[in-house]
Amino acid sequence: METIWVLGDAVVDLLPDGEGKLLQCPGGAPANVAVGIARLGGRSAFIGRVGDDPFGRFMQKTLADEQVNTEWLRLDPQHRTSTVVVDLDDDGERSFTFMVRPSADLFLDSADLPPFRAGEWLHVCSIALSAEPSRSATFQAMSAIRMAGGFVSFDPNIRADLWHDEVELRECLERALACADVVKISVE
């Protein structure tokens, strides 16, 4: 069975418990995909960075406990783990407040990338494209896996407030879509 690599952010979501407290929960679309693949019996591996902090170690342990290969998940001593407060409105719609910007995941660089092999997949989300050096590393990973004979899955998962420039967002999305063999689209 070939590896399905997932590149991006492993996030600690702080969710309201209904009693005025926030619950610490593992999150981030890429981390959720990696866990889902593992739970379905696939071989998943996570590529990314979290802070060398309590939240980062929590995410590393959570992914490992879920049978996700974390060999390529780096603990970054200089940057903090992405942390998001999730709010629910009366209709159950979510909104996100990103508490740590820039977070460790945005400092992913080419040295953090594994060697890819033919037949493997790489799944990425657009948050990894929102800033350098993660943007360049992500595009490099997409190119490298295609050159090795692998495939790319892309989830636009657009969070416009994380981008400084709408033109840059559009250009990055167009480039990523052109690299993708599969695109995951949702109403959001």
Q: Model-flagged regions — what are they?
A:
Residues M1-W5, A64, T70, D90-E188:
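Ribokinase/PfkB-type carbohydrate-kinase core domain
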Residues T3, G18-E93, V100-F107, A111:
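Substrate-binding N-lobe of the ribokinase-like
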Residues D9, D13, N32, D155:
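Acidic active-site catalytic centers that drive phospho-/nucleotidyl reactions
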Residues D9, G48-D52, N157:
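Cofactor-binding loop segments of dinucleotide-utilizing enzymes, especially the Rossmann-like FAD-
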Residues L14, P54, A160:
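Feature marks short, surface-exposed loop/turn motifs that line or immediately flank catalytic pockets
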Residues L15-E19, H123-V124:
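A short, mixed-charge helix-start or loop-turn motif at secondary-structure junctions
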